[in-house]
Amino acid sequence: MDNPERCPWCGDDPLYVHYHDTVWGRPEYDDLALFEKLCLDGQQAGLSWITILRKQENYRAAYDHFNPEKIVHYDDARVEALLNNPGIIRNRLKVQSIIKNARGYLDLRDRGIGFSDFLWSFVNHQPIQNHSLFTPCCRPPAW
């Protein structure tokens, strides 16, 4: 892309720019890609998205490339190993949330519901187009 228009939040970090230009704002329909996104979004709680992006490959390695069939069988020893992995966020609740997400993913599948179909059903299977202008976090005082 030659001089694409970018949102101010991505700044000039090459990883963030790549994410902005190739991932952000593009509809995703693949069940496993959406499962990974759900898990990574949960890891972001209280942190910046760039923090998670910088650790994304570490997460893929640590969580068997977000394979719910494998994650659902993680035992206490595996949880402890994850909590000692310096390449990911080492928070017990966040680790456990990925395991619970895997259970939910497989439960939907076992009921014949695709994860993508489940998520997209909340927006009538259509992306929401938000054309509003950037709104600053602070408003100037009224005159």
Question: Residue locations for each model-derived region?
Answer:
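HhH-family (HhH-GPD) DNA N-glycosylase catalytic core used in base-excision repair
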Residues: 1-143
